[in-house]
Amino acid sequence: MSTERYNAREVEPRWQQIWDEKGVFASRNDDSRPKYYVLEMFPYPSGRIHMGHVRNYTMGDVVARYRRAKGHNVLHPMGWDAFGMPAENAAMQNKTHPAKWTYANIAAMKKQLKSMGLSLDWAREIATCDPSYYKHQQRMFLDFLKAGLVERKQSKVNWDPVDQTVLANEQVIDGRGWRSGALVEQRELTQWFFKISDYSEELLTALDTLDRWPEKVRLMQKNWIGRSEGLLVRFALDAATAPAGESEVEVFTTRPDTLFGAKFVALSPDHPLAAEVAKANPKLEAFIAECHRHGTAQAEIDTAEKLGFDTGLRARHPFDPDWLLPVYVANFVLMDYGTGAIFGCPAHDQRDLDFVNKYGLGNTPVVCPEGQDPKSFVITDTAYDGDGRMINSRFLDGMTIADAKEDVAKRLETATLPRANGGGNAPVAKRQVNYRLRDWGISRQRYWGCPIPIIHCESCGIVPVPVKDLPVKLPDDIEFDRPGNPLDRHPTWKHVACPQCGGKARRETDTMDTFVDSSWYFARFTDPWNENAPTTRKVVDAMMPVDQYIGGIEHAILHLLYSRFFTRAMKATGHVGFDEPFAGLFTQGMVVHETYKNADGSWAAPSEIKIEGTGDARHATLIDTGAPVEIGSIEKMSKSKRNTIDPDDIIGTYGADTARWFMLSDSPPDRDVIWSEEGVQGANRFVQRVWRLVNLAAPHLPKDSAAAGTSADTKPLRSTAHRTLADVSQAIERLRFNTAIAKLYAFVGPLNEAIDDPRLKADPAWAASVREALDMLVRMIAPMMPHLAEQCWEALGGQGLVSEAAWPEVDPVLLVEDTITLPVQINGKKRADVTVGRNAPNPEIEAAVLALDAVKTALAGATPRKIIVVPQRIVNVVV
């Protein structure tokens, strides 16, 4: 048997080829075994995988291999989230077609992923940019449209005047386009929307059923949906100041208890009343236009200076018609939340306080903290938003906030005002539930996306593309010679005959948001060969939901929430029979690395520097010049700070198994892992150690472990092996991979001693117990280090592939300890512990207790009055 070092560069490609040739990881839709669907969020084909990919996909692979060994029919597919702006940028910069760029990147990344030894079913591979995929996405768009889940409407968007395209809120940085740097404008555009808001309450309440999701993610979605209960209050406008035909403004508030602290009413710049007043007020018109020159992102609005324009209108307080409140147009009020109008209570809302301090409107506290003197309680620069009792609020004084809210609601529900459009009176207020969640605008002015299957006809209006004509394919002869949407400029593609009247018409030139592509790919994986429908109902309902979904927490809201909505929309249109796509969700931590900075402030890559010394004496220099380099903070790996490690370099030097092992071993999987060369080298030493143990033992081992027995000689090793197996199994099932690896590290120590023991060559029972322990070790490391495990399995003469071997069974008998430690009390107080045989008779236990130093000291040579032994619980010595 060879004892040469394990050579990953030779071993790993060999086993990868064998797995491919045998189709080991193919999943069958007609398999009778219980299914287990494990999925990692599929990647964007940027051209290179990074260490975050290595960590993410290794975790999923461990779960897949473990579940396969446990007897499940495992579905573990891979695909490509392939549409998106980077491909268009590459086309503009490199004069390359987005499709060519994308598919070249897919080929490169697929090769890299295969080098990791992932147990993927590549037969199910999909790319969202392929017409065979987006054909079905277009079909579902039409189904959603027919079901009333899609609508076309005007919407405020962030418009980049240089790139001539809509920007997502996340693409607006300090008021400028992320790519062009141009000042972003607000524009009113006609957009296509998915009506996710119809599912607000359902999406919210169903979060309680997702008990295998991180609580943090559920809370983030809950806050994003933003359910709020409040009052819709009608403020009558002072007739002397109001435009003709305007008599009131409606305000939604979650704090009706603070009405007596009101100092102003504020309208959104997009409120119809603001527009009406602006017709006769050029200065207000200019102010509204200035508001529109800023982005629509909530974060930008929250951090911007609070600006307002006094319209001259005055609103009457709901409880006091003589109390007139100034009506402003304010840049921080959003039209798409509530009614687009608020009343401001500055003492108890920081945004309102900043506003009144700027415009000198003052504030009146109406909630006083418990224990504070109401007479001396004042607000200056910091609003009070805590609990307390009502003050300065007339009939509400002394009430709790909750009681005050209810009292206000009851009073205003019974009070009335004339209806704005005539026809008698109506209540001043009514209870209402609002949601922060807005409909999902999916229109993008991009080429490289899924075409929206709609035709615009002057005679017939909006006409769906007939299903028989799907897919609507993107044209190949496209030019990226200037900004904007190339589909708008295409000479022929957008011109088409109307399917209804045959007249001249044009195609919809917007494409779908790429989040649509990733909102159903998990369902397509269940039967990607179905050419006639997005899903095969029998198959998708059997294989879904995904049992374990793995990805970054940065997708907690958009992707995961959109997927939950999309699944419900698919159910409503008959494509699936379930509501939730992901039964279990795990969000892994990032891969981080030190940063290094040159004297000129530029970043240095880890491959360019040499680090010497330890602790405070640790320092870095450039390899080429010897110039000193500043060792900076540990941060997420990023190209901009050049603190990245190329997975190809690590796999080429140490092998995929070393990279996988290190990624799993160094920290809990939900926390960041700090990349270190020392840690990788330590992982590689363990690879070599396992290989050495197998090679040393293999020539002396029997074919099986039948002769191991449970003698006093062999039981300790066997018990250690079975205890390790139980612990590793539990850790993997809980996704505590670092804990599993720690148990395996600990197990190798006694296993090494057992192999070095002379009895290996002389005692058949001993050799059989070593055989069992090694077999178990190899099968336990197989999910983490599959190539090494296959090589060791072969060296041990194992049957078939370890990738197809069953997970070992724990013998519960071997988990029972032979000894037990009992507390020893003297006159009811614990003084010592005694370790005895688990089934030792009382006289033996009593003798062991009397031999303890603590008992001897207490007795001082005397005989105890009695010794009480509670079997396997406690011993009490009565002196």
Curated annotation (Swiss-Prot):
Annotated motif 'HIGH' region, positions: 43-53
Alphabetic keyword roster: Aminoacyl-tRNA synthetase, ATP-binding, Cytoplasm, Ligase, Nucleotide-binding, Protein biosynthesis
PROSITE patterns the UniProt entry points to: AA_TRNA_LIGASE_I
Transmembrane segments: none
Keyword Transmembrane helix among record annotations: no
Methyltransferase among keywords: no
GO terms of biological process kind: leucyl-tRNA aminoacylation
InterPro entries found in the cross-reference section: aa-tRNA-synth_I_CS (IPR001412), aa-tRNA-synth_Ia (IPR002300), Leu-tRNA-ligase (IPR002302), Leu_tRNA-synth_edit (IPR025709), M/V/L/I-tRNA-synth_anticd-bd (IPR013155), Methionyl/Leucyl_tRNA_Synth (IPR015413), Rossmann-like_a/b/a_fold (IPR014729), tRNAsynth_Ia_anticodon-bd (IPR009080)
Catalysed reactions, semicolon-separated: tRNA(Leu) + L-leucine + ATP = L-leucyl-tRNA(Leu) + AMP + diphosphate
A Pfam family that the UniProt record links to this protein: tRNA-synt_1_2
Compartments where located: Cytoplasm
Top-level taxonomic group: Bacteria
E.C. numbers: 6.1.1.4
Residues that bind ATP: 639
GO molecular function: aminoacyl-tRNA deacylase activity; ATP binding; leucine-tRNA ligase activity
Motif ('KMSKS' region): 636-640
A Gene Ontology term for the protein's cellular component: cytosol
Principal EC category: ligase
Family annotation (SUPFAM superfamilies): Anticodon-binding domain of a subclass of class I aminoacyl-tRNA synthetases (SSF47323), Nucleotidylyl transferase (SSF52374), ValRS/IleRS/LeuRS editing domain (SSF50677)
Alphabetized CDD domains for the sequence: Anticodon_Ia_Leu_BEm, LeuRS_core
Entry similarity comment: Belongs to the class-I aminoacyl-tRNA synthetase family.
The protein's name in its UniProt record: Leucine--tRNA ligase
Species lineage: Bacteria, Pseudomonadati, Pseudomonadota, Alphaproteobacteria, Hyphomicrobiales
